[in-house]
């Protein structure tokens, strides 16, 4: 699995069809952004279950240990670790609650390279959910941009969802809105994953290699 997003020379605002035999097209960034403004509106709440075993929540959710216990949370991924406009918790905050903690210092800015955390965050979630009774809270300050971006990347990398399917899966269950720069990075990840799958398909025994 790719550990990050490769640099792309493609225009991020145009659609890309990686596999000529597939109907799927990676949308341009603006079209991807429109997915968050179409369909039924989901009211904002502090925390939502968006995938089996995965909750996305906000700072309030992350700080309330009794509430985490009620949800059965065993792992916390803080996508807003740090002191400045972030959620200041850490592993020690959850030690008495027997909750495993992982934090990343991500800024909710379009220029921030959040893709550097795609692989380690996905690995943390994957390992947490390897035990059937575990539940993961992925949070930032509002639970809309940084945390949502990492969950979307996890679904794409570990469950082979396209960026479109991942967005639809999560936005139907929580009010999310990754910033424009994060969407560009998710789009680049989508293209990278599509290219990897196309390469694997062409290298599979009995498959004709296209030139």
Swiss-Prot record:
It catalyses: O-phospho-L-tyrosyl-[protein] + H2O = L-tyrosyl-[protein] + phosphate; O-phospho-L-seryl-[protein] + H2O = L-seryl-[protein] + phosphate; O-phospho-L-threonyl-[protein] + H2O = L-threonyl-[protein] + phosphate. It comes from the Eukaryota. Its main location: cytoplasm. GO terms for biological process: negative regulation of MAPK cascade; protein dephosphorylation. InterPro entries: Atypical_DUSP_subfamA (IPR020405), Dual-sp_phosphatase_cat-dom (IPR000340), Prot-tyrosine_phosphatase-like (IPR029021), Tyr_Pase_AS (IPR016130), Tyr_Pase_cat (IPR003595), Tyr_Pase_dom (IPR000387), TYR_PHOSPHATASE_DUAL_dom (IPR020422). SMART domains: DSPc (SM00195), PTPc_motif (SM00404). Residues 46-195 form the Tyrosine-protein phosphatase domain. Keywords: Cytoplasm, Hydrolase, Nucleus, Protein phosphatase. GO terms for cellular component: cytoplasm; nucleus. One of its GO terms (molecular function) is MAP kinase phosphatase activity. The active site is at 140 (phosphocysteine intermediate). Pfam families: DSPc. Substrate binds at residues 139-146. Its EC number is 3.1.3.16, 3.1.3.48. It is found in: Cytoplasm; Nucleus. Dual specificity phosphatase able to dephosphorylate phosphotyrosine, phosphoserine and phosphothreonine residues, with a preference for phosphotyrosine as a substrate. Belongs to the protein-tyrosine phosphatase family. Non-receptor class dual specificity subfamily. This is Dual specificity phosphatase 29. It comes from Tetraodon nigroviridis.
